[in-house]
Amino acid sequence: MLPITPIKDQGKSPLCWVYAMLATIEMEHLGQGDSVNLSVDYISRMFLEEQAMKRFSTKGSHDISLRGMAPMVIDLLQRYGAMPYDSYFSREPINYNVLSRKIEKTVDMCLAHRYDSVRCLDEVRYQLNENIGYMPSMVFMYGMKYTLLEFAHSVCLPDEYESLTSLEAEPVNKVIRLPFADNHYDITALNIPADSLIKRMEHSLRKGHPVLWEGGPEDNHAVAVIGMGSDNTGTEYFIAKNSWGKDNPTKGLLYIRKDYV
């Protein structure tokens, strides 16, 4: 099993896709001898801010949603940068479902008062500052100063990760748009047979690379796969770092049957 960074807890939020992608990036760096712990709150904040302004620009027709797909995190990193966990985290657990409703009401208030986009963004940021915390403008690490984008590029380049999927209803060995409602950024992936996907996952793990897995009956959970194992009946599993905290029998890990994957 690969070494892992600290287990986090997404609470009741649907932000597993952020937790899982950042965990994958963190553990890729661990494999290179580099320790990095990234801020989920920062990426979640920027996505929520983006959703808020989309609601404003559509005059309230866009519903704010915290759901997404893990590869979207790569896009968010390239747009807004990144922060270390210690630089930006809430000292009290945040109910992001409540916060998203609060932001939605803030945008609706701005629309009702006919505020322009600049003032609306100020109002949204005020709420985010009050509920998550004020953001540093720079990242300081190891005696060096980085902009948020510089720091993001130091931990993840735009084309560093490859997106693969296995969908029977889609053309095989073709790059397709992932046909899920949570795909807000028109993310694409190479569609390959299921057995090929499993082999690629196994190969990556044996080479010391974590694998981001996103799946379920309705593409409804994302985790960072860190190893393989089997039980006393011979059933094979992928072992994953989950984002449901450590107060559970598996101490924050998730065991996924290979035939389920």
Model-identified regions with their sequence ranges:
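Active-site nucleophile-adjacent alpha helix/oxyanion-hole segment immediately C-terminal to the catalytic cysteine
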Residues: 1-164, 205-207, 243-250
